[in-house]
Structures are given as C-alpha cells and as structure tokens.
C-alpha cells in the first residue's frame, strides 16, 4: 500500500457535498463494475437520490475523506448498515478506504452489515482483511443489477 502524499482528514459530509459525493459514487461504480450495465440509474438520478434520500436524512451518515478541500472518497452508512466505501479510482490502495472503515467502526460500536458484489474482488478482499465475515451469498435476483452479491458483517472483537 502506498500512502497518499497529502494529509487526509475525515469529516461528516453535508448538503454542500451532494454533487461531488454522488458523482464519485457514479464514477467508482463504473470503474468497479465495467461488466455491468450502468443504465440502472443515471448520474442525475444518483445526485437526486443522494440529495433527497441520503444527505438530508437523520439516520444516514456520509463520511468524506478529503485533502486540501478535495473529496477523495466517502462512506455512506445508517445505524446498522454500511452502504459502501467509495474511493477515487486513481487513489485506491493508498489507505483511504481503511481510514474510512476506521471511522465507520468507531461510530458503529455494535457492528454493521454490508452487501458487496461478487465481482468487486478488491472491496471483498478489503472487507475480509478488516475482519468482516461472509453471512450470505445470493445469485443477485434480489438486487437492481441482478448481479451475484455477498452480505458481510463486522462485529467488534471478531
């Protein structure tokens, strides 16, 4: 792992971050899943979703990792669920995802669960390395993308 050259800080995201966060979500999904059709939702729909259903909801938290005012990645979670860790493609493998997971674990003392697509081997490997365990695998028939996925869980002390 090559550390990033700039100092990275994590802060709670706010409404002012919605466009950057939603666009980063779109970009990272395209990079992580080149084999998947991306017409399930447009970039504008992602922005609208993050604006209406994430950034303004009291039970949703977005943690952004930034350096010099630039958002490099983010984590989106609820009290029991991690929607995902999203890091700019050109910055993967530099500890930003682990930094975000540190914050998620610190703010979820009872643990959390997440879903990861089987095809996202880098994320799956990171989550296993961080101590998450596989709970369930599906054929993807229950998700919008119809892609096989894995439910994983992290419990403190495991």
What are these regions (language model features)?
Residues 98-99, 119-137, 143-147:
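Conserved active-site alpha-helix within GNAT-family acetyltransferase domains
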Residues 26-52:
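Conserved GNAT-fold acetyl-CoA-binding loop/helix
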Residues 107-119:
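Conserved GNAT acetyl-CoA-binding A-motif
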Residues 9-23:
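A short beta-loop-alpha structural element at the N-terminal edge
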Residues 64, 70-86:
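Conserved beta-strand in the GNAT
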Residues 90-103:
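Conserved acetyl-CoA pyrophosphate-binding loop and the N-cap/start of the following alpha-helix
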Residues 81-92, 116-117:
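A short, internal acetyl-CoA/4′-phosphopantetheine-binding micro-motif in the GNAT/acyltransferase core
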């Amino acid at each position: 792992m090559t550390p990033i050259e700039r100092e990275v800080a994590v802060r709670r995201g706010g409404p002012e971050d919605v466009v950057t966060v939603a666009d980063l979500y779109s970009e990272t999904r395209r990079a992580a899943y080149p084999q998947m059709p991306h017409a399930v939702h447009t970039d504008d729909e992602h922005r609208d979703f993050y604006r209406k259903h994430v950034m303004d909801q009291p039970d949703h938290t977005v943690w952004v990792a930034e350096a010099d005012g630039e958002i490099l990645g983010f984590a989106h979670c609820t009290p029991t669920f991690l929607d995902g860790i999203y890091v700019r493609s050109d910055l993967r493998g530099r500890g930003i995802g682990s930094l975000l997971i540190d914050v998620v674990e610190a703010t979820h003392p009872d643990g959390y669960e997440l879903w990861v697509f089987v095809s996202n081997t880098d994320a799956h490997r990171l989550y296993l390395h961080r101590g998450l365990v596989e709970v369930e695998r599906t054929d993807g028939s229950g998700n919008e993308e119809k892609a096989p996925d894995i439910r994983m869980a992290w419990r403190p002390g495991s």
